[in-house]
Amino acid sequence: KSVLIYNMQKYYLLLIISISAILFNCAGRKIDLEEELSINFNKALKFFNNGKYVRAKDEFQYIIMTDPGSKIANESQYYKAEALFFMKEYEDSWDAFDQYIRFTNDIEKVEKSRFRICECAIASTNIYQRDQKQTIRAVEQLQMFLEDFPNSYLIQDAENAIIELRNKLAKKDFEVGRLYLKLEEYESALIYFRSVLNNYYDTNFADDARIGVMFTHILNDNRKGAKNYYKAEKNRFINTQKGLEAKALINETEEGLSLSHYFQLYK
């Protein structure tokens, strides 16, 4: 019996020693990995700061794949997203920032990342002549940013970006209205001019849309409609010069449009 007890004690002692050795070895490897990745991170950060964004992105990606979920991997995810942004890979950058936001507790970087997502959306928009779905998406992202970070130091930048994007959307509708006007599709022209006034009344194109409505009535042999519209809208012109231009359009077209008016229409 004593021999059996001795053997069991010996077995458990060996087991404890083996487990301790394994744990010590694992801990050592963990420390070695952390040291290795710290070196990689500093190397990647140096590439990033020197504007070598492709090299930086690859190095940060290596860290993310080698030790996923770690603090250094999460920090690498942020800089990978930044590198992609500067590489003008805006959709990939958006995805990378979104991934970073999900797993970080750094509120300051969350705010910066959310605004970067807005910038990615803005950079993905088309010129006004093309489809404007991306512009609408960018406005929505900026509005969500304003709601989520009402005290952000980036508020003014976000508001200015919204103004610029809304002007682009207004210009799109205004130019479509002008096109229909030139094609003598008067009802369609009015739809687009009114869209500017209903949806983008605070933009630079609102006054132009009012004048566009007046032009439409005049070209459609409806001077009375043009005069009544001017009377109803004359105090709503944002720009004084545009208001005077509208008044002159009524006063100078009793006998029809002159060459200068057609130039104004088709310029």
Give the role of each language-model region:
Residues Q9, L23-K267:
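Acidic, polar-rich low-complexity tracts and alpha-helical solenoid repeat scaffolds
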Residues K1-C26:
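Sec-dependent bacterial lipoprotein signal peptides
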